[in-house]
Each structure stands twice: as structure tokens, then as C-alpha cells.
Amino acid sequence: MNKNTFAKHPPMGWNSYDYYDTTVNEAQVRKNAEYMAEHLKEYGWEYIVVDIQWYAHGAGSQRDRFQYIPFSGLETDEFSRLQPDPERFPTSVGGKGFA
């Protein structure tokens, strides 16, 4: 393996936390993903990361007290996998996950 050709560039993508913190919703993720696909994909941008508390009900709603809501409500599937907050990610309802 040639050390100069192993990684031509770092992983490139968009992370929801960088702008939206814990408050990101489905419409915002979709808009950013669409923009990235249309304008940045040809330059190697390929990852969309929906970060911290995408699963938490009311995330970001108590900014004056804390950044993260401790012990917020969660939804899990039959295998105990976290499910997206259905209020912020409406297409996830019914166990569809991120659509």
C-alpha cells in the first residue's frame, strides 16, 4: 500500500450538529442533503450525519436550562434500537426509520 495514495481526501460530508445542534428536523436534513447532492457530490462530498438527540422528544426545547435534555422520552423498536423522534422526523412513523 502506498502511503501517498491511501486516502486522497478525508471523509467529506455534512453533520447536523454543526449548525442545528440538537434541534434538527427532517425538512432541514432533506434540504441540506439535496443541496449537497446537487452541488458538492462531484467534489467528493458523500456523507450525511444526523447527530445527537435525533431520537429525543423535545430536543433543544429547553435551551435556557440545558443543551441536552436528560432523560427525554425515547422510542425503540422490538430490538431496542432507537427510533427517530416522530415529531421532528414524520416519515419515520411506524418504524420506517430515516426515509
Locations of the language-model features?
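Mature N-terminal, pre-catalytic/accessory segment of carbohydrate-active enzymes
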Residues: M1-E26
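Aromatic-lined carbohydrate-binding/catalytic grooves of carbohydrate-active enzymes
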Residues: N32, M36-A99
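Extracytoplasmic/periplasmic, Sec-exported soluble proteins
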Residues: D21-Q28, P90-G94
